[in-house]
Amino acid sequence: MIDRRALLRLAAGAGTASLVAACGWDGGNGVRPLLLDISRFNDWVGEKIFFSPRRLAPQYDVAQRTAVLPSYFISPEMPMLRDPAAWRLQVGGLVREPQTLSLDQLQAMPRTTYTVKHHCVEGWSAIATWHGVPLSAVAERCGMLPQARYVRFDSFDSGYSNGWDLASAMHPQTILAYGMNDNPLPPTHGAPLRLYSPTKLGYKMTKYLVSLTFTAERPGGYWEDQGYPWFGGV
C-alpha cells in the first residue's frame, strides 16, 4: 500500500523524470530506479484509482465494427498448432481441482459476447466482436482457493507469459475468447484460445493460451519484464 507521503514522493519523482527526459539526458543507470518507481506508481494509480471491478467498458453496435485488427506476423518457422483437436488448456495453481480442458468443454460453458474497442499500446484502436467463456466461470469450475491473488497466463510459445491481478481477471468482461466477429478465432489472433478484456491494453491479452495458474505471488511477464506497465489498464 502506498501512503500519502510515498504518493507525494513518487509524484515529485515523475516531475523530475519528465524534466530529465525533456533535457534529453538519460542519466545512465542512476535514472533506472526512479523510472521503476514511476512505473510502479502508474500501476498503483491504474489499479487502485481508475479500475473498478464493477465498471464496464462501453459496448458498440455490430455495425460499428472497423477493419480487421492488426495482428502478429506469423513466421513460417513458427511452431503453429498442427492439430487443434489435440489442444488443451491446463488450469492449476491455487485451485481445489486442477483441470485439463478441451475447446469443446470450454465452448459448453456459459458464453459471453460483446462488441468493444480494442486499444493497443502503440496508439491505434479498433472495434470488434469477441465471444468466449468468462474467466470467472473457469475459476469457479476449478474451485479457486481464497489464497489466490493473481493469475499467470502462458502461451504455447515457450517463455511468453503474462500476469494479472485477480480483480482484473475476475472482471465480468474478462473472457477466454475462442471467437471473433461471428467466426472461430483465427490463428493470427491467437487461435484456438486467447485472453481478452476491453479494460486492458492489447499486450496484456495472451494469445495461443495453453495454461493459466492461480498464484499468491505477483507473476512477471514477457513485456512487463522489459519495462512495460504491469497493470496495463485502459
What do these predicted ranges mean?
Residues 1-18:
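N-terminal secretory signal peptides and thylakoid transit peptides that target proteins
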Residues 21-22:
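C-terminal motif of bacterial Sec signal peptides marking the signal peptidase cleavage site
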Residues 25-234:
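Structured, non-membrane catalytic/scaffold regions adjacent to prosthetic-group chemistry
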